[in-house]
Amino acid sequence: MNEKSLRVLEFNKIKDELKKYTQTSAAKDLIERLHPYESAYEVREHLMETEEAFKISIKKGDAPFSGLYDIREAISKAQRRFTLFPSELLRVANLLRASRRFKGYVKSDDLSEKYEVLESITEGLVPLNGLEEEISKCIIGEEEISDRASTTLFNIRRSLKDKTSSIKARVNSLIRTYSSHLQENIYTVRGERYVLPVKVEHKGAVPGLVHDQSASGATLFIEPMSLVDLNNEIKELRLKEKAEIDRILAFLSGKVYENVDVIKVDADILWELDFIFAKAKYAQKLGAIMPIISEDGHFNIINAKHPLIDPKKVVENNIYLRDGITSVVITGPNTGGKTVTLKTVGLLHIMAMSGLMITASQGSTISFFKEVFADIGDEQSIEQSLSTFSSHMTNIVNIIDSADENSLVLFDELGAGTDPTEGAALAVSILENLRKRKTKVIATTHYSELKAYALKVDNVENASVEFDVETLRPTYRLLIGVPGKSNAFEISKRLGLPDYIIEDAREGISEETLKFEDLIQSLQHKNIKAQEHARKAESAKEEAVKLKEKYESKLDKFQDIREKAILNAQKEAKEIIKEAKEEADKILKDIRELERMGYSSDVRKLLEENRKKLKDKLEKTESKLNQPKEVGEAVTNVSEGDELYLPKFETKVMVLTNPDNKGDVQVQAGIMKIKVNIKDLRKTKETKIEKRQRKKKQMSLNLKSVATSVDLRGMDSEEATYTADKYLDDACMSGLSEVTIIHGKGTGVLRTAINDMLKRHPHVKSYRLGNYGEGGNGVTVVELK
């Protein structure tokens, strides 16, 4: 595709908008290289991937790109066996996490709705769960290594903590001893060593090593001799800590090196997916649709809108090139929307052929073209001193040299900028030449000669942009099949030009021309009325379809509920009948045995007893089938912590909140939290002893399974909040008193969301950011009630 047309049609602006929806700079690079594809097959394939991403993101929410970065530099370093920074390793882990999650994200359990293209792409993803877990365990922030990274690091940091506590106690004691010699009763740190701020005139009173002096010279920062050994020990521990961290980073970097080929493939696939889902997000923002792709050179774009014009201001138009037509000639006033129409046709074709959905209505058809040529606007070169006409003609010469039956050509004001007679003749000749080649052409013009040409010649159709004579404003509506009419007399009259001047002007025009213009005006009015009726009919049809879909949905839902109820009832009945049948078989077996033995009086008596037993059992079975299901006693007062029964789900629930003014409460049903009205709840028959035993057993089970921390890194705010909320419930039920939520440092968005949730969580007593060694700002430590 020629670059000039892409530039003139402003495809670069579309790509700039598309980049806003990517997560990585690698995906932005893919967008920068985006061009129309070279075959209709490729176009359909890439449109299908966009449509699948569009559908899956609506059904399942945003794709799992959270925490994904461009790691090309980290991959390059790993290939050269360099040690990676913690931030780089963390991003590698995030990429591996995204790989793992994406495979599940695109997998559909619904056989009727498969995401074949996306599933094919994600088949190449190879999650490295072990490496992901190893990095996540060791690195808890872009600059912080976890105490859990190794036993050695844990022991070093524990010793550091002990030594730091000792030196702080010692230095506080020295502050009290030397308080009269200090500028302030505080300690400070210079070169990672604890020192005291001693007045310069009292330096002899505090024996020790001078490390620094204040800017004013009034204070010396002295390390007392009694702190030297402790400071040395702390310094030594910090060096050991650094050495151990370097070893851990080198070890993890080595693991990345061992798997670098797999990681590189995963990264390439994820960046491609980032690009694909950016196309889907942009389509959602535009309200775009998946077009049908034809290869016959004809198209029908329904309610086409220019994607770069404000949606509140843009005018929709039906733009089509029907079967048997190769060229459309559009006439109408300046600023009437002719140029926008040309750009809309060209840009929507470029977008579709680049795998992007288009701003139009469902059912729209786009044709695949090998080339789209556009001579729009005045791109003359001042340096070349080209006139408007020369500039356009230079461009037209290039188009004539290259265009064929697989090309779409867009001409704006064909033949303008020179003598009208010669310009019109040239325009007709150019159109005729391209018509003979079967090149598809849309051209705008002011020349009446081109209107006449379109009326006389096969395969060429007239069109016009509508003009409202009452308001003297263009409506920007395109009328295909109707040539444009000159409105000079009507406009002049409404602006106040005397009638006698207008009449004199009319006399200068042939009667045939006037009749032709009147015919055009009549056609325009009829076309406008027909389109208005069509719009109303379409609106009524859409409303009817929506109502039909609404009630069909309700009917389907009712049918599902009914079938489920019948299925449950049948299942229960079968169980009861099965029990009765087993009992009956046993009795009949006994009867046959008795008959074989003969009929003594004792035997006959036993036989009658067994027959009566069978009869009673069957009567009980029938009674059980007809007996309504017991749902328990209704409740009137409900409090937080009550355990009740929810009949509609046939499960016990725990009440989490007191009733609001409508009687609604939040309850926990298994892993679900739902809101119900107290009238839907029933008392349980469970005794207090059973309840205590069950709770004790449940707590025992939970204590075995609930960890003391939860890792939320790589999740978005919504997923992280839900996961943390559920985790806190489980931790509380397990009897844990303190837990750690790992959210990472990053931009702070995740930490803020978690803090907002913790403020109002019923199980939270207090919370704080982690201390050094716990994870710092990358974790939040929560104390539970």
Curated annotation (Swiss-Prot):
Signal peptide feature range: none
Classification via Pfam families: MSSS, MutS_V, Smr
Residue ranges annotated for the Smr domain, each copy included: 710-785
Biological processes, Gene Ontology terms: mismatch repair; negative regulation of DNA recombination; rescue of stalled ribosome
Gene3D superfamilies: 3.30.1370.110, P-loop containing nucleotide triphosphate hydrolases
Keyword Glycosyltransferase found: no
Keyword terms of this UniProt record: ATP-binding, DNA-binding, Endonuclease, Hydrolase, Nuclease, Nucleotide-binding, RNA-binding, rRNA-binding
Spans traversing the lipid bilayer: none
Organism domain of life: Bacteria
Purpose: Endonuclease that is involved in the suppression of homologous recombination and thus may have a key role in the control of bacterial genetic diversity. Acts as a ribosome collision sensor, splitting the ribosome into its 2 subunits. Detects stalled/collided 70S ribosomes which it binds and splits by an ATP-hydrolysis driven conformational change. Acts upstream of the ribosome quality control system (RQC), a ribosome-associated complex that mediates the extraction of incompletely synthesized nascent chains from stalled ribosomes and their subsequent degradation. Probably generates substrates for RQC.
Matching PANTHER family: OS10G0509000 PROTEIN (PTHR48466:SF2), OS10G0509000 PROTEIN-RELATED (PTHR48466)
Protein name (Swiss-Prot/TrEMBL): Endonuclease MutS2
Organism phylogeny: Bacteria, Bacillati, Bacillota, Clostridia, Eubacteriales
Gene of this entry: mutS2
